[in-house]
Amino acid sequence: MAAPVRTVISPGRYVQGKGSIHQLGEYLKPVGSTPLLVADDLVWGLVGHDVEASLKNAGLPVQRETFRGVPSAKEVDRLVEAIKSSGSDVAVAIGGGSTIDAVKAAGFLADIRWANCPTVASTDAPCSALSVIYTEDGEFEEYRFFPRNPDLVLVDSQVVANAPVDLLVAGVGDALATWLEARATAQSNSNTMAGGLPTLTGTALAKLSWDVLWDNALQAVDAVRDTR
């Protein structure tokens, strides 16, 4: 029997900052030359202009496919066909967890790279190597696991702050819970979804997330509420 190993997986590149969506094109260029942008109409109405301008400034073509709301097997297959017909070499999800999960699954099936630009805090989807697939009626169907994480995750903190405050609160709760999960996994020396025992790096990041949120989350939520 092979000896147990420790492993950690993460996105190829993580970018975060106020106004960083204006640099999306710049960060996409090393990933692919023909991106397909996937966003629903609501999200595109909020950030589409900035995304288009960013890609044009970087000399990249602007091709957009509308996400239809549910990351179902049917929607994933439709996006695969859209990727193939557009000749894209990187699929870019812009939006929440449902959009991101659908694009990751489609990018994997189309055998191209994928990138994520989340617009809310309330999801683990942006950095993970899996997708949650639902039925057309919105009921859970399956998890799909991938051999790699997104090549790029770009988070515009101002866009996230502009989203409904309940989504920020949900994201804070989810991130706090990550430390409890990571601590339990480390103490029990159990395998993680990365395919091995937990690393000191992964466990330390979960603890750091807890510490940062414990010290700052309430003030951050209050600040977002004050801008409403």
Residue ranges and their predicted role:
Residues G12, F108-L205:
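A glycine/threonine-rich phosphate-anchoring loop and its flanking beta-alpha core
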Residues G25, E52, D77-V80, G173-A184, ...:
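Predominant activation on well-ordered alpha-helical scaffold segments within soluble catalytic domains
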Residues I21, W44-G48, S98-A105, T123-C127:
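Short glycine/serine/threonine-rich phosphate/pyrophosphate-binding segments
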Residues M1-V90:
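ATP/NTP phosphate-donor binding region
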Residues T192-R228:
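Active-site segments that bind and position negatively charged phosphate/pyrophosphate groups
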Residues G17, G97, L176:
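Short, conserved catalytic/metal-binding motifs centered on acidic residues
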Residues I83-V120:
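A short, small-residue-rich loop immediately preceding and capping a beta-strand
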